[in-house]
Amino acid sequence: VALKTRESMWLCEAAGFDVVLVETVGVGQSEHQVGSMVDFFLMLLLPGGGDELQGIKKGILELADAIMINKADGESSSLARKTKLHYQSAMSLLASNDFWKSEVHMCSALEQDGIAECWSMMMRYREQGTQRGALERRRAEQNLQWMSQLTDEMLRQQLSDNAEIQQALPMIKEKVSTGTLTPVSAAIDIINMLGSRS
């Protein structure tokens, strides 16, 4: 996830786009970041016997509002059905939110099968979430997270840009690593230097 993904999404919405797609590559930290930015989190997976379920962190599954098993066509159809069953079973163990129970479906991008149903499901989610005020609450929570993230980034940048801090930092690090200064005292000293500049 790029540093300015939220800003890019906000600009797209301001320009009148009512649907903004955010794609990630793989399972990891980026999914958690995107999960705190979007209204609907769709996990797209390939057919597999369910063995890969062990490799997917529970936290990622908890983020998913829906799972689509792609390539559910040709020789992969049977495997896609098995994969769907594995994920339905796993998802049934997770708590649902206040208005939506995560769904698992199959599709074939190659044959354009299941794509319309996927879109219909997302629109159903949007309608239910809007009616219950859940999407508005989710956006408000996301904005608070964004504020915290921006505050952290801006403070880090100020620390990095402060010549006094950068000059003192090697000595402070040396004192912390030798035990002559506690990490807490060091952090307080650095923050005080930042405050003395204003």
Model region roles, listed by residue range:
Residues L3, S36, G55-K58, E62, ...:
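Residues on a specific face of well-ordered alpha-helices
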Residues V1-S30, M37-L44, D51-E52:
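Nucleotide-state-sensitive switch-loop elements of NTP-binding domains
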Residues V1-L3, G48-G49, A72-S78:
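Flexible beta-alpha connector loops of hexameric P-loop NTPases
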Residues Q29-S30, I56, G114:
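Short acidic active-site motifs
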Residues W10-G16, Q33-M37, K58-E62, S96-F99:
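Conserved catalytic network of the ASCE P-loop NTPase/AAA+ motor domain
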Residues M106, E117-L194:
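Long, well-ordered amphipathic alpha-helical subdomains in the mid-to-C-terminal portions
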Residues A66, A72-R132:
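Canonical P-loop GTPase G-domain recognition
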Residues T5, E23, I60, N70, ...:
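Residue-level signature of catalytic and energy-coupling elements of molecular machines
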